[in-house]
A protein has these predicted regions:
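Short strand->helix junction
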Residues: 7, 90-92, 320
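N-terminal periplasmic/intermembrane-space "pro-region" immediately following the signal or transit peptide
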Residues: 1-4, 8, 12, 17-49, ...
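Glycine- and other small-residue-rich loops at beta-strand/loop junctions that grip anionic moieties
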Residues: 148, 182, 255
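A short secondary-structure junction signal
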Residues: 170-171, 179-183, 204, 215-217
Length: 338
């Protein structure tokens, strides 16, 4: 017997809430007994993003929405073992509940850590960091279209660490994305290495090799590859970041589709609470088609209330050479982080 979708969502949300309330009460009891560090230790965290969006594309009405609502728990089981569980009550684009992250880390030393579970795939900057850290309201549309993983995450194992001016993360994952069962035997290999050139300036190289299913009946196994170069300068008051990505999907034994794109973002901290940003992005969904090109210029501002909680405004000037009906987008967002 199939339960209604609303019943499933209610049970899902209720179960998460009960577990998190129990863990929160456990933390409070532990902190009351002693100020010393004890294991296991837990902390509750989460955020809500409420938006007002007006998309000038025909058939897209303006309106308010809860874009994301996430609640999670993280902590340490021992000095070397930590964990993170993060659930989304509402996740784009369908506004349905999803498991965001669920993984455990084992720290051997600063050079080598092992992670197992569902986590952000180590590729580039934007896809490899939490969305609340992005200077813009949303990750660039270019990177979202060049991304191959649902929610930029997948299930597998990862090794990561740092040494002096060098850091790395290498993972072996299913290749199907978050909350999706594996369908084929080959696994995807993905990773990034970063080099800190000076204080606040880092460059990175990323690579991804894997397989996917395609064809009318989704039963044809093909190869796909991605590579990226990123630069990130965390200056004050000026900060900049950018990524260039190329992706190649094997369609048939003799045909490949090559996609290229990237973005450049610059921001300026006017005060401790107020900053402005501008981002340029471009995408060629098929490098063999001359007029197949998308360009977007985003102008925005952030006002920080406390910590990562902020009010943001973005306006996207969008130019799609193929789809002329793809018009500009205005978005205002209240982000509350706790």
């Amino acid at each position: 017997m199939n339960l209604p979708k609303n019943t499933f969502k209610l049970n899902y949300i209720t179960s998460i809430t009960i577990v998190l309330l129990f863990l929160t009460s456990t933390v409070y009891a532990q902190s009351s007994d002693s100020e010393q560090v004890s294991y296991p230790s837990y902390s509750l965290f989460g955020f809500v993003q409420q938006q007002f969006a007006e998309d000038l594309t025909p058939g897209s009405p303006a309106g308010f929405s809860i874009h994301r609502a996430r609640l999670g728990v993280q902590g340490k089981i021992s000095e070397n073992i930590s964990f993170r569980f993060f659930g989304g009550f509402i996740e784009p684009p369908q506004s349905n509940p999803q498991l965001v992250h669920a993984y455990m880390d084992y720290k051997i030393n600063s050079y080598l850590n092992i992670r197992a579970g569902q986590f952000l795939a180590p590729f580039g900057i934007e896809g490899n960091e939490g969305i609340i850290l992005n200077p813009a309201i949303e990750r660039s549309l270019t990177l979202r279209r060049l991304n191959t993983f649902r929610m930029f995450s997948d299930i597998g194992v990862q090794a990561f660490g740092s040494l002096s001016h060098f850091n790395y993360a290498i993972a072996l994952v299913n290749g199907t994305g978050a909350n999706r069962a594996e369908q084929i035997d080959p696994k995807d290999f993905i990773g990034r290495v970063g080099f800190n050139l000076t204080d606040g300036l880092e460059i990175g190289l990323s690579g991804h090799a894997g397989h996917y299913l395609t064809g009318q009946e989704m039963n044809e196994e093909r190869a796909r590859y991605r590579a990226a170069l990123d630069v990130n300068y965390k200056g004050d008051p000026l900060f900049v970041r950018g990524e260039l990505v190329t992706r190649k999907d094997n369609i048939t034994n003799s045909q490949d589709v090559v996609m290229n794109g990237g973005y450049f973002l610059a921001g300026y901290k006017v005060t401790d609470r107020f900053e402005t940003i501008v981002r340029y992005e471009h995408l060629k969904p098929n490098s063999d088609v001359d007029n197949d090109r998308l360009e977007i210029i985003t102008m925005g501002a952030n006002y920080y209330l406390m910590g990562r909680s902020r009010i943001s405004v973005n306006y996207d000037f969008r130019d799609d050479k193929v789809n002329e009906d793809f018009e500009n987008l205005f978005t205002a967002q209240l982000q509350f982080v706790f």
